[in-house]
Every structure is written in structure tokens, then in C-alpha cells.
């Protein structure tokens, strides 16, 4: 069947996701500003970002990005109703627990780079490094991925990748935390903890026809070290406030499915599904659907929905009369059983061949009575 000109364009976009060669590479600068606001003015995030992608000949592509965000607001933590102004100075016996929004501010900066190297066979090796830093958390991640073309027509590829993350957790105030030792001489923290994350993923991508593509992958990850949140408290025996304690190991695995389809000359969609499970008894399902409508040669509209659901961790409870002498205990709602829905809209405006503008608005609702709005505006310049 012969495709019209617009379908050829959509087919090219679809194929370029699979055919990661310099023929389809772009040199560009992307600048965005993201604003995130939770309901009841709980948490607000302002995050400007910049990304640069540069192709060096036919064998190398470099990508560099920088994000800096300012976070402010309050997070619900169990504190003593009489003396509790923070997570730490509320800890002890004979307390009167109350869940209170404790205010905080944070400045966070993260940077990443990746380098794609293409071999004579046009197989690809991608090496990437990212670093994220804030006053009490320092994350460093190194990853490598190998992509192999199954045949000369390049309609199928296999990839295998691995990453290692080293996280430094700086606990600033441990006056009431018996686990804390002498202050860290470099950071000034009361205690310096670390955690390690090792992840692997294996996948296959298949170009079905000129308008559709499918990708499937499986993943496995292990975490060890300090996996608790130093600011979260747990109520034991109804009147004792102590630091939460999570296991120091975590093993997770699952799979991802992706399907991309150009239905008509102006309508295309991306379907994603993710299954995740771990030995903390958390199992989650994620369904993500994004649809795009090309209104004309300059304007593309986007709309989508993301649904997420998970079961609760084996050591989680929301009740203050639940925990006694259990080894592991947490009141963190992120470990609870919940579901969430995100509604997404976007507009992309192509001002010229080299310059385009974008704006998107996402509405997030979670069954734990949390809701938020994401707004992103920016531009992309091809050079």
C-alpha cells in the first residue's frame, strides 16, 4: 500500500526512534521552565533546565543537560504536639504524636551527559554520567548501554544496559537519633550514610511496518545501604516517636512495553505499560498513553493520560497505634497502597525550520488526597 506524503513523515519519525544513526541526529539547544505546585500550597518547585545535543561527524553524539530547581513548602511528619517543631527534636518517649506539615526549603542542581559512539557495524555504545546535589543528598550515576542491529535492514535491534548509582545521604541534625555518630568533617552533617543501586535492562525493538514500532524490555535492580528517610518519624506504642527504619536491601524486577503507531496522516499515539515488583511487597502497574494531532504544518496538539497503582510495603502503616517493636516501620505515604491519574495536554508551535516553542499542562491526582499541577514552557533551537 502506498503512503501519502504526510504518512511518510510520520513513518520517518517512528523509524528514527529505532534507527538511532547520525543520519537522523539533530544538533539542538532546548530550554525549559517547569513549575510544580501541590494542593494546599504544600510543595512548590521551580525548575529551569537547558539541554544541548551535538553530533560530531557520523560516529559520535554528545548530549549535555543541566537542571536547577528551588523546592519549598511543607511535608506531613509525625511530631510531638507540644515540642515538635522538626522531625528530630520531637523524638523520644512519652510524646503526644500529631501529624503536622513541617516546612522546608531546598536548592537542588543536577547535571548529566551522554556520549553515543557508533562502531563500523553501526552498533552503538552509550556511556552516561549524571550528578544531582542538594544540601543533604548527593547522587552519582554511571551507565553504559550497548545497541546491536539484528540485520542490515535495521528493522530490529537488541539492547543491554547497566547502571550504578552511589548516593550520599547527609543527616544534618541527629540530636534525638541514637543511630547518629560524630559530625562529618567535610559536609558538616551529623552523620553521613550511603546507598548503592545497581540496575540492568535487556530489550528488543521491532519496526513492524512504516507506521508502527514495538519495544519490550525486562529490568532488574538491587539497592543496599541506608534506604530510610532521615526526616520521617514513626509512632511506636502510641506515644513514642522514633526515626523510621526501612530494610537496608531491596531487590526489584519487572518489564516495560511500548507501542508507537501513526494511525492517519495527522494522528499518532504512544502506548506504554510498566510492571514492577520488589521484595518490600510493593507491586505497581503504570499505563501511559500519549496522543498527538498535527493541526497544521506549524501546530501539533498533544493530550494523554497516565494511570499508576501500587500495593503497600510490608512494613508500612498509617495508624499510630500499629507499631510496637517491629524491626522495620514507616508511615511514609509513598510506601502505601494508592493509585494516581495524570491528565496531560501540550502545544508545540513550529515558528521556523530551526525554532519551535512548547507549552504543556499536567494535572495530577492521587488517592491519598494529593493533587498537583505541572506547567512547562520552553523552546527548541536546531543549529
Language-model region placement:
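Cleavable N-terminal export/targeting peptides
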Residues: 1-28, 178-184
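Repeated loop/turn-to-beta-strand initiation elements of outer-membrane beta-barrel proteins
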Residues: 27-29, 59-62, 121-127, 153-158, ...
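Hydrophobic, lipid-facing positions within transmembrane beta-strands of outer-membrane proteins
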Residues: 46-50, 109-113, 140-144, 158, ...
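Outer membrane beta-barrel transmembrane domains
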Residues: 83-101, 219-221, 227-256, 277-288, ...
Amino acid at each position: 500500500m502506498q503512503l501519502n506524503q504526510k504518512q511518510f513523515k510520520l513513518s520517518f519519525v517512528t523509524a528514527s526512534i529505532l534507527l538511532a544513526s547520525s543520519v537522523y541526529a539533530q544538533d539542538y539547544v532546548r530550554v525549559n521552565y517547569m513549575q510544580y505546585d501541590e494542593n494546599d500550597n504544600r510543595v512548590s518547585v521551580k525548575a529551569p533546565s537547558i539541554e544541548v545535543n551535538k553530533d560530531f561527524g557520523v560516529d559520535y553524539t554528545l548530549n549535555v543537560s543541566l537542571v536547577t530547581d528551588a523546592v519549598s513548602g511543607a511535608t506531613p511528619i509525625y511530631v510531638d504536639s507540644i515540642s515538635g517543631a522538626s522531625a528530630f527534636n520531637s523524638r523520644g518517649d512519652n510524646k503526644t504524636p500529631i501529624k503536622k506539615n513541617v516546612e522546608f526549603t531546598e536548592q537542588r542542581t543536577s547535571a548529566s551527559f551522554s556520549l553515543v559512539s557508533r562502531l563500523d557495524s553501526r552498533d552503538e555504545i552509550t556511556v552516561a554520567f549524571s550528578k544531582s546535589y542538594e544540601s543533604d543528598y548527593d547522587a552519582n550515576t554511571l551507565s553504559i548501554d550497548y545497541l546491536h542491529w539484528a540485520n542490515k535492514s535495521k528493522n530490529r535491534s537488541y539492547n543491554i544496559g547497566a547502571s550504578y548509582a552511589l548516593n550520599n545521604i547527609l543527616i544534618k541534625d541527629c540530636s534525638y537519633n541514637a543511630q547518629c555518630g560524630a559530625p562529618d568533617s567535610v559536609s558538616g552533617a551529623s552523620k553521613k550514610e550511603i546507598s548503592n543501586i545497581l540496575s540492568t535492562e535487556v530489550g528488543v525493538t521491532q519496526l513492524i511496518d512504516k507506521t508502527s514500532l514495538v519495544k519490550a524490555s525486562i529490568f532488574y535492580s538491587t539497592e543496599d545501604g541506608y534506604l530510610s528517610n532521615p526526616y520521617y518519624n514513626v509512632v511506636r506504642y502510641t506515644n513514642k516517636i522514633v526515626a523510621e527504619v526501612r530494610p537496608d536491601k531491596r531487590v526489584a524486577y519487572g518489564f516495560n512495553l511500548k507501542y508507537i503507531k501513526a494511525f492517519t496522516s495527522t494522528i499518532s499515539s504512544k502506548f506504554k505499560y510498566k510492571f514492577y515488583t520488589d521484595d518490600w511487597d510493593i507491586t505497581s502497574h503504570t499505563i501511559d498513553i500519549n496522543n498527538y494531532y498535527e493541526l497544521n504544518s506549524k501546530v501539533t496538539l498533544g493530550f494523554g493520560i497516565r494511570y499508576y497503582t501500587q500495593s503497600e510495603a510490608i512494613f508500612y502503616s498509617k495508624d499510630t497505634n500499629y507499631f510496637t517493636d517491629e524491626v522495620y516501620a514507616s508511615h511514609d505515604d509513598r510506601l502505601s497502597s494508592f493509585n494516581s491519574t495524570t491528565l496531560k495536554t501540550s502545544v508545540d508551535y513550529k515558528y521556523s525550520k530551526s525554532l519551535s516553542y512548547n507549552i504543556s499542562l499536567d494535572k495530577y491526582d492521587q488517592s491519598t488526597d494529593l493533587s498537583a499541577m505541572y506547567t512547562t514552557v520552553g523552546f527548541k533551537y536546531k543549529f
